[in-house]
Amino acid sequence: GKAAMVLALQHPDLLRRLIVADIAPVPYDHTQSHQIAAMRAVDLSNITRRSEAAEQLSAQGVEPALQSFFTQSLDVAGKQWRLNLDVLEAQMDHIIGFPEVSGQFPNPTLFLTGKDSDYVLPEHRPLIKSLFPGARFAKLPDAGHWLHADKPRAFEAAVRTYLDA
């Protein structure tokens, strides 16, 4: 989401419209390092199925929707995560930050958020509207920040509706 926003703001001519999933163009102070730690805690040496990794993630306190989402990034045969957890951890400050950028993206933009998420707050809307004057907002019920993992069918339906309009 943040990379797509930066692209849209720096090169608005490259995009006709934009969908941003539960993130605002602001720096955040909470990290996802605990999720990385949970993934690192999984003993991959004896894993033969994703469900076994999901069980270990559950023991680390990872909620079911994220267990499924994270285990999609598991190379079971290779006994490794496809994600570079070291780089994600090392770059967390950049991941949770947002660069100083100028410009606007005037084209239609959907900010799709989870109703139970606190990532896109009402106080972010003036900034969002100043950078993305064509912004519209929609919320997925019963979804948090990881809305595509929490409610994949509802997420897909909202995206399709927006793109088909």
Model regions and ranges:
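Short, well-ordered alpha-helices that flank and scaffold nucleotide-derived cofactor binding pockets
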Residues: 6-13, 126, 130, 157, ...
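Conserved acidic functional residues
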Residues: 21-22, 84, 150
